[in-house]
Amino acid sequence: MQEYYIGPDLNTQLAALLQKLNVTKVFLVRGKKSYTSCGASDVMDAVLNGRGIKTVCFFDFLTNPRVEDVRKGVHLCKSQCPNIILAVGGGSALDMAKLIRYHIYKETDSYIPLVVIPTTAGTGAETTHFSVCYINGEKQSIADSAMLPDYAFVCSELTSHNDAYLTACTGFDAVAQAIESYWSVNSTDESRSYSLKALGLLWKQLPLLIKNLDNKELRSEVAEGAYYAGRAIDITTTTAPHAFSYKFTSLYGIPHGHAVALTFPYFFALNLYGERLQSTLDSYEYGQRMKLLVQFLDADRSDFLSCQLHMSTYISSLGLSAKALTFDELASAVSSFNEQRGRNNPVVIDEEVKSGLQNYFMELKESDKE
């Protein structure tokens, strides 16, 4: 069971935890420039140096962690014998720390407590039991209970350095997580309660935050909403929009949240209509669930295109678009997607769905010419 803290005064809360755990040595997995620019370095210096805690830093890894980077981190961490692993950064830093702890546990049966502090709002890495890692250029999702952080601190002040684009990418990832978890075949009463709680903090607030980046109240709500979106997908995992997103990142360098947004309007409409559902779903219950989601998001469900346009308009308000990619680049996702995530989707992903997605991309590029 994870312990978590959401709010200000990170210094006091973290210091109290370190004292409780009798920490004398920390293996710190962190970002590079962002670690200083977000103010985390000042907080960590004050808390760790103030208690005389020895710190070993690891930041020698790419933005999208590779298995080679994980091996380097595992080797260094094992050689240092820390009391805890502390991760401070965006999704990549947190995933790296989770993978390091997981591999050490599997190799040595030694369980090192993991404390995470996200500096972006939206990846969900602080509250999930899975991580992503690139193996031979392919993005793999690895799930295990040993990757769930033991402690998470969500402090919105550390996200205040995020510019509009980063805020949009990570924030929309959280919105997508909440919605995908809600319609997932693995959805439960608990996960749906987390999804709706997340959307109540994200849906209206995120576009406002993009236009008012210095608004502390909006920052706080979005950070909290992102945490609960992570709680939701920790139960259900993600669905089709995530399944089709990975190639956009690995081949074309599109940040993850932006990559998810590229297909989201199509799958939003497809899943709200709910034709050709997975056999495990009750069509009446699913239909009632989608009615509530439509009301919650104030969406137009009068026809497929109106539903699709509703989400497209929302994503455009965040400044995210497909203009940077050609039709061929967009279409590459159709033939290459994560089948495991695809099976979580409420509507069966078959050739007709893939053809519909390709037509959607074609319409996108035609609209770019206008």
Spans of features found by a protein language model:
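C-terminal and late-domain segments of enzyme folds
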Residues: A168-Y228, A232
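A glycine/threonine-rich phosphate-anchoring loop and its flanking beta-alpha core
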Residues: Y102-E190, L281
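Gly/Pro-rich interdomain helix-loop hinge
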Residues: I254, H258-E329
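Short Gly/Thr/Asp-enriched flexible loops that form oxyanion-binding sites at enzyme active sites
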Residues: V43-M44, K72-V74, A93-T108, T128-F130
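Short, amphipathic C-terminal "tail helix"
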Residues: F327-E370
